[in-house]
Amino acid sequence: MADPLDHCPDPAQMDPAQADARIRALREQLVHWAHQYHVLDAPSVPDAEYDRAFQALQALEAAHPALITPDSPTRRVQGAVLQGLTPVRHALPMLSIQTETDTGAGGAQAFDARVRRELGLTDADPAIEYVVEPKFDGLAMGLRYENRRLVQAATRGDGEIGEDVTHNIRTIRQIPLGLPDDAPALLEVRGEVYMRRADFDALNQRQRAQSGKTFVNPRNAAAGAVRQLDANITAQRPLRFFAYGLGAVTAPGEGGPAWRTHYALLQTLKSWGFPVAEQVGIAHGASQLAALHEQIGARRDALPYDIDGVVYKVNALQLQRDLGFKTREPRWAVAHKYPAQEMPTRVEGIELQVGRTGKLTPVARLAPVFVGGVTVTNATLHNLFEIRKKQVRVGDTVTVRRAGDVIPEVVGVLPGQRSAYVANFRMPAHCPVCGSAVVREKGEANHRCTGGLFCAAQRKEALLHFAARRALDIEGLGDKLVDQLVDAELVRGLPDLYRLDLVALSALDRMAEKSAQNLLDALEKSRQTTLPRFLFGLGLRHVGEATAKDLARHFGTLDAIMNASVEQLLQVSDIGPVVAQSLHCFFQQPHNREVVAQLRACGLRWPEGAPPERPAQRLAGKSVVLTGTLPTLGRDAARDLLEAAGAKVTGSVSKKTSYLIAGAEAGSKLAKARELGIPVLDEAGMLALLAGE
């Protein structure tokens, strides 16, 4: 490549055509050098040479500002500090993947058996081909390119709505700002933002030298850097990126790529300048999956970054389409984790934590021990039965691990280490916080405080849950402020939050008038919410974000949910008898209804609509399978229509299948249905069937 700096005249003396040609050449050279340095780890020029070209480009763009484009290397850090992160709805949901609980070879065998069963394969059919990738311990990210330029980067968030962090992601030099001409007009690349261990250690050293905040582990450091409001701070953090998949992309029929395998897709992303992990491999069948899991695990500590397992993906994209998705996870992928790292330490005490629902959780206070990249001082003991099973006592030397490499827990007591007799731990008869009676319901392992919102601990946890980002998202309402509000008896229940005023808040410790006003503004903003967020924020037992969305989608209004019978609740997707009974009991309690009424009276509101009309149960008792791509309906929409008509939608074809609904690129399921003589319908035929035609 010719040196674009040769015979470089004064930028101000160049006409627009000359400047444009020189700018294009410099950008091409800088992008090439940056790819060699940041992606390939193979720099080809000294830093001084890169800096000289970069400064020349800056001078040219300053002299000819009309020629500046968003994908220029000089545009990686730009703009003022943001006031907040903007929510972004993903064009396609960023779903999580299922985790195999068996960390040995059985995990690979279970996944392979499940995939074969879903596809209707027998032992006589050939082994399935899989791609095996490292499971990075970082932050999931979606990069959206339009007309081959990076226009948006968003975090996963709750899978449907993330946060726009484009200003920060542009600072990561491994991520291309522009793509080659053979890339499609629309491309959303999904991957992981992470930090190498050596870079993390160096960052903490710099922070300590500057008396700054140090970080617990590389993942937390990366996540915090990505969510900065000031991109200049993010630019100083050594963030990196690995690509591992796609979201929205131009369809093959509209000029987009037509990949046949996931592995081919990864190689294309690599050719477009995206970093792809070197440890990606191909496996055929369960035995090869288990072998790669073991091989990568053996090299785990030698890798420059943290992984907590591997991810298996069915390689053939047509088979991925055939397998489809469960409610929140793809059927064609799974995470197979490694056994957690373990270390010995001493139990210095056992204390009780009272949770939002009154659950009393014993927590072991430990002599500090470094496990899996963090210093651990506390570990959960779960419940009294777990303590008795493991025979944990104060003073014991125990083995501690980070379960899933995240949550510390006590594995067991090291034999022969108990120095003297210590009494067994006993669960108290009364709550250590409020003095209310402690009970254990029949069939449950957990003890609970009966104090309800009378218990300050439960009240505090309920307020924090209500204010959480994925609930009412009340910015500034953290644990220290909640402690003050409850201890000062300014807030006894959720509605009291909306009765706070500037005078009362300003009188609190470390609460200046500006901070108080900011909280009042956040409370005002939270009054406009959504029904799923409100339901989740109430902290109902067994009701997480996904169940809250299912309830809102099914019933449409809060009143319909509150007045639903157990039988009506059981009709909601993924709700079983325990959850239905718990929900019904909650809304039958006058106190809970009064809390909801007061919150509404305080101005909380959300869009509501009547639940969707359900077609007659024309397909009651029928088993239906979906395969391929339908012309107008998405897979979930088609499933909803069929289930609303009483059908059971399954993932595999068998003799019990009543109908196969087949779209474009239908694969093995279509062949199996024809072999068994099962009626095959297209989308129009399905709609006609639902209409009773």
Swiss-Prot record:
* InterPro entries per the UniProt record, alphabetical: BRCT_dom, BRCT_dom_sf, DisA/LigA_HHH, DNA_ligase, DNA_ligase_AS, DNA_ligase_CS, DNAligase_adenylation, DNAligase_N
Alphabetized UniProt keyword annotations: DNA damage, DNA repair, DNA replication, Ligase, Magnesium, Manganese, Metal-binding, NAD, Zinc
Give me the segments passing through the membrane.
Answer: none
Q: What is its EC number?
A: 6.5.1.2
Pfam families noted in UniProt: BRCT, DNA_ligase_aden, DNA_ligase_OB, DNA_ligase_ZBD, HHH_2, HHH_5
Q: Which PROSITE patterns match?
A: BRCT, DNA_LIGASE_N1, DNA_LIGASE_N2
Tell me a GO cellular component.
cytosol
Q: Which SMART domains match?
A: BRCT (SM00292), HhH1 (SM00278), LIGANc (SM00532)
What is one Gene Ontology biological process annotated in the Swiss-Prot or TrEMBL record?
DNA repair
Q: What class of enzyme is it?
A: ligase
The answer on whether this UniProt entry bears the keyword Zinc reads yes
Q: A single Gene Ontology molecular function, please? A: DNA ligase (NAD+) activity
Q: Which family does it belong to?
A: Belongs to the NAD-dependent DNA ligase family. LigA subfamily.
This chain belongs to which protein, by name? DNA ligase
What species is given as this protein's source? Verminephrobacter eiseniae (strain EF01-2)
Q: What is the lineage of its organism?
A: Bacteria, Pseudomonadati, Pseudomonadota, Betaproteobacteria, Burkholderiales
